[in-house]
Amino acid sequence: MIRTKLSKVKEIRTPHGKKVRWLISKEMGAPRFEMRHFTITDESQPSEEAHPWEHQVYILSGEGIIKSGDTEIKVESGDAIYIAPNEPHLVQNLPQQKFTFLCIIPAGCEDRVKE
């Protein structure tokens, strides 16, 4: 069993100003999945991304927008989202909203922000 506490995990800023904390990772002994906690504020710059792995996202607080191609959905606390491998996507907060969510990805993904 692995246990972590959000307040004890180092916060890292992505190049676009998102704040991420790696709650569970391969380095901690999780062989198949990793869990990240994201915070997006008005200081963050939205950027479209696509990765060869799937994402599962659970919205904790605030409201935001998730865009994929021509589809744009408003999301809020309690929503769960699946993003397929290689699906272009953009996640952003609504103005003046602190937006937090969990993102679950397969363990060992290559191009990730970690320090």
Tell what function each PLM region has.
Residues 56, 63-65, 72, 88, ...:
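Structural motif
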Residues 21, 36-51:
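Conserved short histidine dyad/triad with adjacent acidic residue
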Residues 46-48, 66-67, 83, 89-95:
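Short beta-strand His + acidic residue motifs that chelate non-heme Fe in jelly-roll/DSBH
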